[in-house]
């Protein structure tokens, strides 16, 4: 039985070598997941999250030289930047997993459960947005659009 069995550890390399990589164990610690999801699917969420977060970052952060220059001008140290980057990627991957595992059924309870899980992915993506703002030196947007 796969429920409650531990997920195997797999390092998912970042396409940009100077940016931090994430391990599937990091996702297991962030979310309550077990072997029913599978290590390859978790790794796929992380790869997609890399693409999403890297797409939201300015192009100047993809060169090691310009990244170091950015860190010195924005008064953010490398460790803080790395933590914010990991937080952004992890929460985006968690939001992707939450979106894919929304439980809808034909009962009213299923619709309520689905709505709760959608707000969970919205909260996770707000953390992603705040982390990217912290990395780039932009102000955090705290306005909720209807």
Locate each region found by the language model:
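Short loop/turn elements at secondary-structure junctions
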Residues: 81-146
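Conserved short "hinge" loops at termini or chain/domain junctions
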Residues: 1-72, 133-146
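Short, glycine/alanine-rich amphipathic alpha-helical segment
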Residues: 71-84
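Alpha-helix boundary/capping detector
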Residues: 52-57, 72-75, 111-115, 119
């Amino acid at each position: 039985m796969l429920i409650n069995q531990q997920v195997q550890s797999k390092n998912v390399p970042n396409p940009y070598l100077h940016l931090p990589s994430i391990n599937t164990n990091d996702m297991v610690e962030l979310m309550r997941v077990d072997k029913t999801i599978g290590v390859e699917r978790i790794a796929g969420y992380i790869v997609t999250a890399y693409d999403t977060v890297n797409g939201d970052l300015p192009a100047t952060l993809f060169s090691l030289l310009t990244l170091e220059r950015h860190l010195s001008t924005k008064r953010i140290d490398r460790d803080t930047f790395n933590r914010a980057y990991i937080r952004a990627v992890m929460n985006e991957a968690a939001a992707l997993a939450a979106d894919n595992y929304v439980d809808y059924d034909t009962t009213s309870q299923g619709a309520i459960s689905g709505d709760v899980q959608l707000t969970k992915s919205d909260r996770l993506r707000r953390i992603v947005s705040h982390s990217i703002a912290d990395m780039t030196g932009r102000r955090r947007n705290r306005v909720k659009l209807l």
